[in-house]
Amino acid sequence: MERTFLAIKPDGVQRGLVGTIIQRFEQKGYTLVGLKLMRVSRELAEQHYGEHKDKPFFPGLVNFITSGPVVAMVWEGRGVIANARKLIGATNPLNAEPGTLRGDFAVDVGRNVIHGSDSPENAEREINLWFQTQELVPWEPALTSWVYEM
């Protein structure tokens, strides 16, 4: 089953959106297999955003993600990477559709509430960066047969 990494950023945590965000993914039928509230170290932030290291906005990304608590999550399900991106919405909230998390809860690209992996390769990299294998709990909800055609 496909997995993706999501992180509720400090603005989402501070604004009390954690439960709402988790609920959206549960209601879609995805399974939460990893969850932790954490303070992100500069080292982890720099590794996570490493692809942007030479860009002018890199220091701002690192400073923001380390500015407060983050909820790191791993979700599992068919098509979870692409569908999570749809649920999250465009990176710039001004371009995000209403009904998406960013369309409903964010107004500034620098405070866009949530991060989600954008590809299977990045999902694997980010999951391995943020979680140890033993922190992930594979399980099958009783509702699986009501979500997926077997």
From Swiss-Prot:
Enzyme class: transferase
Catalytic residue positions: H115
Listed Gene3D superfamilies: Nucleoside diphosphate kinase-like domain
Catalytic activity as recorded in UniProt: a 2'-deoxyribonucleoside 5'-diphosphate + ATP = a 2'-deoxyribonucleoside 5'-triphosphate + ADP; a ribonucleoside 5'-diphosphate + ATP = a ribonucleoside 5'-triphosphate + ADP
Subunit structure as annotated in this protein's UniProt entry: Homotetramer.
Coiled-coil segments on the chain, per record: none
Cofactor or coenzyme needed: Mg(2+)
Official protein name in the record: Nucleoside diphosphate kinase
NCBIfam families with a match to the protein in the record: PRK00668.1 (NF001908)
Family: Belongs to the NDK family.
Keywords: ATP-binding, Cytoplasm, Kinase, Magnesium, Metal-binding, Nucleotide metabolism, Nucleotide-binding, Phosphoprotein, Transferase
InterPro entries assigned to the protein according to its UniProt record, in alphabetical order: NDK-like_dom (IPR034907), NDK-like_dom_sf (IPR036850), Nucleoside_diP_kinase (IPR001564), Nucleoside_diP_kinase_AS (IPR023005)
Top-level division of the source organism's lineage: Bacteria
Gene Ontology BP terms: CTP biosynthetic process; GTP biosynthetic process; UTP biosynthetic process
Gene (UniProt): ndk
Residues that hold ATP according to the record: K9, F57, R85, T91, R102, N112
Transmembrane regions listed in the UniProt entry: none
Keyword Nucleotide-binding included in the entry's annotation: yes
Database matches in SMART domains: NDK
Record has Isomerase as a keyword: no
Function: Major role in the synthesis of nucleoside triphosphates other than ATP. The ATP gamma phosphate is transferred to the NDP beta phosphate via a ping-pong mechanism, using a phosphorylated active-site intermediate.
Localisation: Cytoplasm
PROSITE patterns attached to this UniProt entry: NDPK, NDPK_LIKE
GO molecular function, one term: metal ion binding
